């Protein structure tokens, strides 16, 4: 997973994350310096996911082109915001 921030925070590249997609539900989990982070959401249609992480006041979107191995989107969490890109296995 690659994460880019709007602030001067350096980007995270190649970070490990777990992706589970089951029907129209999606769960993304990863670890950071504060512990495990879990975003859960649903496919709103055609690979457009809306996710939340209530513990971090996080909201996110992820989008997937049908033949792509990537999920890409925007996130907001505890006042920070940026973009992320996840490579599917």
In which residue ranges do the predicted regions lie?
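Central antiparallel beta-sheet cores of small beta-barrel/beta-sandwich binding domains
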Residues: 1-89
């Amino acid at each position: 997973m690659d994460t880019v921030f709007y602030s001067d925070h350096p980007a995270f590249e190649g970070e490990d994350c777990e992706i589970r997609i089951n029907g129209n539900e999606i769960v993304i989990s990863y670890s950071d310096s504060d512990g495990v982070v879990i975003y859960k959401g649903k496919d709103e249609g055609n690979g457009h996911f809306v996710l939340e992480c209530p513990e971090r006041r996080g909201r996110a979107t992820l989008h997937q082109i049908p033949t792509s191995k990537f999920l890409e989107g925007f996130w907001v969490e505890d006042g920070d915001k940026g973009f992320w890109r996840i490579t599917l296995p």
